[in-house]
Structure formats: structure tokens, C-alpha cells
């Protein structure tokens, strides 16, 4: 009798674990593929992550990321997409330009942050919730003006509040004007996740 109870308990626990695992996988799949803010148009988007160059009649090839010239002459010239937005990869930026540190003027605190470079169309393709200010404009992006958008947690950590549009911060000792502050986003939204966003040309130079 006791043995039957033991096996019954094992079956129940095993079934429960199996169901829980399937549900967890389904939830993760939904989060990674569904249209969830700020990635509200995943089902309509295409991504260009790398460029492959072939030479010697296709016998050799060279793979690389999308450089500024390719972006300007090819991607921005596409007519089929409704919008073309360009970003840097925040996860690999430390390997390309080194660690990124941000500091409020006069403060001794200089936390390391995850920074993403982007263009002005980024804010039209992705739907962020602005708590203060607004994204940097096209003219600011094209002229390379040092602008930055912070997430809520970083703004509060640096300046103690979220109403900070128009104030300045130092990113690797370069002064940036805060354009706006957005609600924190989940790291699950890996294509747009960062703590601060700057015009991408400046992002590479920081």
C-alpha cells in the first residue's frame, strides 16, 4: 500500500514538472516572438546582422558587420521597407570601444552601463514609453549632436529623479544632453535592450 502511494506521488510530481516545463517553454517562446512593447512589430520586421562578401568566383568569402557606408548606401536606400532603423549591438560594444561609464556632473559615482547606438528612425520603429522629454530628432542625429536617452532606473540613480530632460551627463568624459527618459525595458527584448541610447555615430566614437 505504501509502495503504491510512493509511485502515485512520483507520477503526480513527474506529470506536474513536465507540464510546468512545457508552460515555461511556451511562455519564453511567446515573450521572444510576440509583439510586445517596445518591439511591437516583430511579425513585420526583417533584420540585417552581417554582410557576406564573395570573391574569386564564389570560392572565397568574407563576413563582417554592417559598416557606415553599407548602411548609408544600401540599407537607407531600400524602398520596400516602411522604415529602416539602425542600431549598434549593445552586448558587444564593450569589446569594440571598451567599457562605457556614465556620470552626473559633480558626482563621484560613475557606473558602467549598457549603451546602444541608434538612429532617429529607431524611435519610430520601436515603441518606448517616455516619462520625460522625447527622442533625439533627425536633425540632431544627422548633425552628430551628443544626445542621450536614459532609462528610468539610470536617470534616478544618476540624478535622483526622472524629470531630467535638458540636463547633461558625462559618457566616458564626453558631455551629452539628455533628450528624454524612458520606462525600463526587459532584457528579454534583446534587440533594443540598453540603459542608455545615443546617436550611433557618436556611440562608436565614445
Predicted regions and their residues:
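Solvent-exposed, non-transmembrane alpha-helical starts
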Residues: 57-69, 109-113, 142-146, 185-196
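Glycine-rich loop motifs involved in handling phospho/adenylate chemistry
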Residues: 13-17, 138-143
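The feature marks short, hydrophobic/small-residue-biased sequence motifs that occur predominantly
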Residues: 87-135, 141-142
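Mid-to-C-terminal secondary-structure elements
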Residues: 116-136, 146-206
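Generic structural signal for small/hydrophobic residues in well-ordered secondary structure
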Residues: 1-4, 11, 32, 48-50, ...
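Short, strongly hydrophobic transmembrane alpha-helices
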Residues: 4-32
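Membrane-proximal extracellular/periplasmic loop immediately following the first transmembrane helix
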Residues: 25-101, 109
